[in-house]
Amino acid sequence: MGKSLEWADLDYELQPWIKKAINVSGFDSMTPVQASTIPMFAKNKDVVVESVTGSGKTIAFVIPILEKIISEGINNSKFKKGHFYSLILAPTRELSMQIQNVVSSFLEHYPEDQYPIRSQLVVGTNEKSVRDDVNTLLDERPQILIGTPGRVLDFLQSPSVKTSSCGMVVLDEADRLLDVSFFKDVEKILNVLPKQRRTGLFSATISSAGTLIFKTGLRNPVKITVNSQGKNAPTTLNLFYSVMKPEEKLQNLIHIMNNIRFKKCIVYFSTCVSVTFFYQYLKYLQQTDKTLREDLQVISIHGKLTTQSRRKALSTFTESLSDCILLTTDVAARGIDIPDVDLVLQIDPPTDADIFLHRCGRTGRANKIGRAIVFLNEGREEDYIPFMEVKNVDIEETDINKNKISNDNNDEFYQRFTKWLLSDRANYDLSVKSYVAFIRYYSKHSATSIFRLQSLDYVSLGKMYGLFRLPRMPEITKYLQDKEKSGETVVGYYGEGWLMNPPPIDMDKYAYQDKKREKARIEELKNLAQINDKKKLKAELKKKNMAWSSKTMTKEERQERRKKLDLKRKAIELEIAAEAERDESDTEITQDWKDEILQKKKKKKVGSEMQGSFDDL
């Protein structure tokens, strides 16, 4: 018989104000992971929790922390200044802020007549320094700290911050916190905390952390795994894939945005610069070209934005009442809980298979229906589907690209794209940066048997970014050379990097709309022209005097060789002379040595003759 999911059936009584917070939030019953985790974590057990995305893991550790603060009597004025009771670590600022919001939503119902329970956010921002965070700890005396590893480590290194009262630690998205980019900081943080503490690790893919989980100071942990019928994705989440050429991806994205109904959609790109580039182009299509519906709100967020910008963008997306689309990177892939996200699109699969689940998990949360679609390039990338099946993730093909885009429509779309690029050289520069960044990203894919640079269609990929001329890159040079050797024709490539014939513009006359940038470009062009003339003159002089130069070099080489031979000859003569002197002084020893060898030879000869005579007997 399964564990009861009724809040009333917990084996201990929840605080009345926590019950009220649960009721106000609309959590009528517990999720399976909450029913399994809350009793364990609240009763002095270390836990390692693996559960599908959107299953309520945050509540599963927030309630035990609040309960323990009450039961341990931490909510009183005697709690020491500069101390804290619990620490929650998360890999991103966005997830940290979300956890802070969940804690705050519970504390809104905390009795005003009792000593307050407070939480503090400790994340890197341009607005606050580490010193400011320390002052907040000293002034407000929060019992709960929530933050990212880098900032928390700097924070804990302050002599004013005392760690001896820390009784509970949570690693949310633990597999990410234990990978190479965070592990050193996390390890240092855990080393300065008391060993006698409760530790909880939470993630949808904790198994990928392997043996590293044992380096977190766990003591007799309880492993809690909650899957949906043996699958690694919730049953309310429908996973789809669509196979197409790279150049068709953007056109399909716009088709979905214009024709498929959704409230909120998250679109994942590979790199920060790609988010910026496609955001600018989509805004152009919406405001100028009028081919993207005007009632759709388009927002972007990525890791290179300031904390304030990221926070504002995420808040706008979360609170928007109109149809809304968020262009982002994996910065918004883990743990972020945004209501009403009913569609997730991945323009390319992530480098890590675990990230695929985290991306998809932004929809289909809290038993709501969600759809997630990943775009795959034609060819080798189609093997990604059986690859994910091995990881218990079933993905069905969707008919979004069933009616293949006609060449005429594709050409028309591409020409409209290049028209935007041609309007300002800055657009082209951003396109090139996005293209190059994607190739670098692709080269670092963990599933190298599927995602190989040798199999990438560089020309079609260039058209996806609107490029009319490919940049010079070793990868592209090798790609073209391999095609030439095999006798294959590269469709859509017209030599010297051009993807359009005739070339749509003279690159020397390709201008920036920004006057300062254009002036700097013209100056640089003049300087390069002078340098190029000098190089050309030097090349011609070298060509004219090539035979003479060769002869001169040969003559010099001969002279140098003679000098070396003379020196070598003299060195040999000196060595011979020295040997002769040694021979004269050691004549007797040498003679004795020769005599000894002769005697040995004679003995061998006699022995051989004697052996022969014995054989004759």
Swiss-Prot record:
The lineage of its organism: Eukaryota, Fungi, Dikarya, Ascomycota, Saccharomycotina. One of its GO terms (biological process) is assembly of large subunit precursor of preribosome. Disulfide bonds: none annotated. GO terms for cellular component: 90S preribosome; nucleolus; nucleoplasm; preribosome, large subunit precursor. Component of pre-60S ribosomal complexes. It holds the Pfam family CTT_SPB4. Belongs to the DEAD box helicase family. DDX55/SPB4 subfamily. ATP binds at residues 51-58. It comes from Candida glabrata (strain ATCC 2001 / BCRC 20586 / JCM 3761 / NBRC 0622 / NRRL Y-65 / CBS 138) (Yeast). Its EC number is 3.6.4.13. This is ATP-dependent rRNA helicase SPB4.
